[in-house]
């Protein structure tokens, strides 16, 4: 696994828009304030040509232009890391126009983004053997003040963070809108983890610890990549089978039945054959129940059969805040009741 160099004080942060750009509010103002904050912190900035573009469908521009931007800016020596402008809908089409041979030959650099950016973070690990950070996109850094999760994410890029913890509360409903683009997360809900060992719920005060190599992202994107020419998951699993895999997964548009279908699909594709544990984020359909199926049984239908720890409702994904996850890194996870710690090991 290749680990990028840390961004140094005074270094250059690059911004790209392989999914949505920051053309409309509240993202336009939030991205502008993020740039202001980074400059005040002493960093140089390099903006890709699509950061404010809105010509594309489900992404900032045409797939060709988005793929070209992503390839050129990742391989460029004029920036030291890349932060994606945002998530979106069709970044998979961007990846058809990314030159992965150039990415593999380039000096690795940190790439930060989540949601649709799974198309980059997952493929960097499985195709390019390069670590990246599954975490907040550029506009989030415009909030006033920063949430601790943003400090943690930027700390990973700087090399100052090697351990992340769960956050006290999470956001059920965002207050950020066109009139209030810089509002921080509206954290009102206490963090309550649902921990299982196989199908058995963990007891009060029970300490759970497991380690392995982190792989995963947004399930919507992962099952879309599965079986395509970009799916090199099998080779990755064999290379790192002695480490075992910690699968981190979260869902955006999937309802509870779609989550269960996604888990079945990944299981039948052999993706979970060396699993050491699951980290499951709060799904956007949090609290949904359909025909007797809830978000927990949707996951446990497969994960519960593996006799490994399954930690659900973790700070991960579309219901902020999220612990930034270093995709491809070795990690040790420690859980007790509602407390969770992830310690990264760059080997």
Task: Please provide the spans of the model-predicted regions.
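Buried hydrophobic positions in well-ordered alpha/beta secondary-structure cores of metabolic enzymes
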Residues: 15, 82, 116, 222, ...
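C-terminal active-site/capping subdomain that shapes the small-molecule cofactor and substrate pocket
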Residues: 256-347
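ATP/NTP phosphate-donor binding region
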Residues: 1-78
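Oxyanion-binding "anion nests"
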Residues: 213-252, 256
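Structural motif
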Residues: 81-83, 112, 246-248, 279
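Long, hydrophobic/aromatic-enriched structural stretches that serve as scaffold segments
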Residues: 75-98
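Short, acidic/small-residue loops that bind anionic groups at enzyme active sites
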Residues: 98-124, 131-139, 309
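Conserved anion/nucleotide-ligand pocket segment
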Residues: 133-220
């Amino acid at each position: 696994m290749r680990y990028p160099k840390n961004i140094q004080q005074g270094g250059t942060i690059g911004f790209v828009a392989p999914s949505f750009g920051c053309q409309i509010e509240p993202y336009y103002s939030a991205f502008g304030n993020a740039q202001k904050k980074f400059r005040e912190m002493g960093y140089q900035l390099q903006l890709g040509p699509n950061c404010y573009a809105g010509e594309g469908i489900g992404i900032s521009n045409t797939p060709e232009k988005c793929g070209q931007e992503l390839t050129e800016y990742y391989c460029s020596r004029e920036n030291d890391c890349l932060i994606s402008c945002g998530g979106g809908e069709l970044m998979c089409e961007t990846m058809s126009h990314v030159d992965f041979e150039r990415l593999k030959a380039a000096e690795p650099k940190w790439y930060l983004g989540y949601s649709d950016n799974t198309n980059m973070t997952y493929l960097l690990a499985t195709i390019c053997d390069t670590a990246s950070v599954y975490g907040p996109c550029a506009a989030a850094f415009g909030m006033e003040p920063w949430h601790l999760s943003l400090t943690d994410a930027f700390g990973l890029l700087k090399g100052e963070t090697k351990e992340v913890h769960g956050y006290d509360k999470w956001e059920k409903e965002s207050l950020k809108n066109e009139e209030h683009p810089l509002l921080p997360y509206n954290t009102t809900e206490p963090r309550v983890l649902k921990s299982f060992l196989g199908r058995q719920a963990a007891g009060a005060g029970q300490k759970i610890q497991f380690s392995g190599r982190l792989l995963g992202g947004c399930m919507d994107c992962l099952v879309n990549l599965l079986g395509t020419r970009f799916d090199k998951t099998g080779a990755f699993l064999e290379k790192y089978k002695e480490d075992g895999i910690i699968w981190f997964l979260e869902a955006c548009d999937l309802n509870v039945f779609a989550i269960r279908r996604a888990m079945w699909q990944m299981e039948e594709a052999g993706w979970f054959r060396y699993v050491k544990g699951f980290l499951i984020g709060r799904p956007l359909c949090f609290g949904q129940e359909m025909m007797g199926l809830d978000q927990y049984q949707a996951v446990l239908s497969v994960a519960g059969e593996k006799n490994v720890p399954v930690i659900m409702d973790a700070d991960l994904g579309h219901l902020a805040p999220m612990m930034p996850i270093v995709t491809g890194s070795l990690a040790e996870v420690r859980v007790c009741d509602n407390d969770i710690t992830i310690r990264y090991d760059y080997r």
